C-alpha cells in the first residue's frame, strides 16, 4: 500500500499530478442492489482496463501469470501510449467457464459453496464466510488479522497462467 503512495508522490513531484485512489479517504465499500458488496475503486478492474487480465467465474482476475498476483494502481495525468488488450473488451475471455462452458473448478474448490456455474460468485456470502470462519481461524492459529481463503484460486487450470485452451488469445 505504501508503494502506491510513494509512486503517486514521486510522479507528482516530477510534474505529473497523481493519486492512489484506493488509499484516498473517500475509498469505501458499499452494498449495491445490482452487484452486492462493492467498492468505489477496483484494482482488478483497473488491471483489466490496462490489459493485464480478465475475470473468472470466481470474480478473480486471470492474468498471464495466473491468479496469484496483486495489483495496486496509481492514476496520473500523463500522456502514455495505449496498451492494447489481447482479449479486446471481453471481460471473461480467459475463463474456461465463460469462454467454452467447461471447467468450473473454482466453484468445486470453494469451501463455502458460494461460487456456482449458474450464478457466479456471491460476494456477500464469500465476505461473510471469510469474516466468520477463516479470519477467526487465522487469528487464533497464526495470530494474524489476515482474511485468508483463496482456495478457489489454487489447484485450478488458471492458477498459474491463462488456460492452455485459451492461450491463443495472448
For the regions a language model picked out, list residue spans one by one.
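Catalytic cores of enzyme domains
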Residues: 1-170
Amino acid at each position: 500500500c505504501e508503494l502506491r503512495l510513494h509512486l503517486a508522490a514521486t510522479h507528482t513531484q516530477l510534474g505529473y499530478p497523481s493519486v492512489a485512489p484506493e488509499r484516498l479517504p473517500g475509498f469505501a465499500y458499499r452494498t449495491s442492489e445490482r452487484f452486492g458488496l462493492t467498492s468505489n475503486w477496483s484494482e482488478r478492474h483497473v488491471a483489466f482496463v490496462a490489459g493485464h487480465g480478465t475475470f473468472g467465474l470466481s470474480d478473480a482476475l486471470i492474468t498471464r501469470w495466473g491468479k496469484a498476483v496483486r495489483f495496486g494502481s496509481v492514476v496520473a495525468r500523463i500522456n502514455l501510449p495505449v496498451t492494447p488488450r489481447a482479449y479486446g473488451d471481453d471481460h471473461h475471455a480467459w475463463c474456461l467457464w465463460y469462454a467454452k462452458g467447461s471447467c468450473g473448478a473454482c466453484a468445486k474448490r470453494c469451501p463455502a459453496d458460494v461460487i456456482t456455474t449458474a450464478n457466479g460468485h456471491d460476494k456477500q456470502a464469500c465476505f461473510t464466510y471469510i469474516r466468520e470462519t477463516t479470519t477467526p481461524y487465522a487469528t487464533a492459529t497464526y495470530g494474524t488479522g489476515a482474511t485468508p481463503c483463496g482456495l478457489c484460486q489454487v489447484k485450478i487450470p488458471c492458477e498459474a497462467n491463462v488456460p492452455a485452451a485459451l492461450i491463443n488469445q495472448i
